[in-house]
């Protein structure tokens, strides 16, 4: 152990340097967000919990084309189409999404020709059981009704880039 090393050790040079760095950051504003009480703004392109949308007259948008089911890489979407109606259109009888399988890629939303299936703004949907992550048509429509205003605004903001 040399004299220089002994002097540095005795004067605690490294400790003093570390203390200066600590004090420098101590008085700066905190970059951390206090999460449950404060939330950062979400991008209009955010992909969260799925929702099925309705037209303003209350009719569901989904035309049972099954493009979302075909394009889903995780095979998380299951659709059963009902019989053709008098006007020649079809509607879904069953629309299920297995959120355990879903990878939130957004391909279902891009494939939909009528903007029926969208990924909404909600990212807080933790559950206690796996069964709660199997979304049926009623739950997806309820999500769409709950967030319709925000979803429509996000689609409008994203329209120039689509």
Curated annotation (Swiss-Prot):
It holds the Pfam family Fer4_7. This is NADH-quinone oxidoreductase subunit I. [4Fe-4S] cluster 1 binds at residues 62, 65, 68, 112. It comes from Afipia carboxidovorans (strain ATCC 49405 / DSM 1227 / KCTC 32145 / OM5). Signal peptide: none annotated. Residues 52-82, 93-122 form the 4Fe-4S ferredoxin-type domain. One of its GO terms (cellular component) is plasma membrane. Its EC number is 7.1.1.-. HAMAP family: NDH1_NuoI (MF_01351). The keyword DNA damage does not apply. NDH-1 is composed of 14 different subunits. Subunits NuoA, H, J, K, L, M, N constitute the membrane sector of the complex. GO terms for biological process: aerobic respiration. It is found in: Cell inner membrane. Keywords: 4Fe-4S, Cell inner membrane, Cell membrane, Iron, Iron-sulfur, Membrane, Metal-binding, NAD, Quinone, Repeat, Translocase, Ubiquinone. It is a peripheral membrane protein. The gene is nuoI. One of its GO terms (molecular function) is 4 iron, 4 sulfur cluster binding. It comes from the Bacteria. [4Fe-4S] cluster 2 binds at residues 72, 102, 105, 108. Belongs to the complex I 23 kDa subunit family. It catalyses: a quinone + NADH + 5 H(+)(in) = a quinol + NAD(+) + 4 H(+)(out). NDH-1 shuttles electrons from NADH, via FMN and iron-sulfur (Fe-S) centers, to quinones in the respiratory chain. The immediate electron acceptor for the enzyme in this species is believed to be ubiquinone. Couples the redox reaction to proton translocation (for every two electrons transferred, four hydrogen ions are translocated across the cytoplasmic membrane), and thus conserves the redox energy in a proton gradient.
């Amino acid at each position: 152990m040399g004299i220089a090393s002994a002097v540095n050790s005795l004067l605690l040079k490294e400790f003093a340097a570390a203390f200066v760095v600590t004090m420098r950051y101590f008085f700066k504003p905190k970059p951390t967000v206090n999460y449950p009480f404060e939330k950062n703004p979400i991008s209009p392109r955010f992909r969260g919990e799925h929702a099925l949308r309705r037209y303003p007259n209350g009719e569901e948008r989904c035309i049972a084309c099954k493009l979302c089911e075909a394009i889903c890489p995780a095979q998380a979407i299951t659709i059963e189409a009902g019989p053709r109606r008098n006007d020649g259109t079809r509607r879904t009888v069953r629309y299920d999404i297995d959120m355990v399988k879903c990878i939130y890629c957004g391909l279902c939303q891009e494939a939909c020709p009528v903007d029926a299936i969208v990924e909404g703004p909600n990212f807080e949907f933790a559950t206690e059981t796996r069964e709660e992550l199997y979304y049926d048509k009623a739950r997806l429509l309820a999500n769409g009704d709950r967030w319709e205003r925000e979803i429509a605004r996000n689609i409008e903001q994203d329209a120039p880039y689509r």
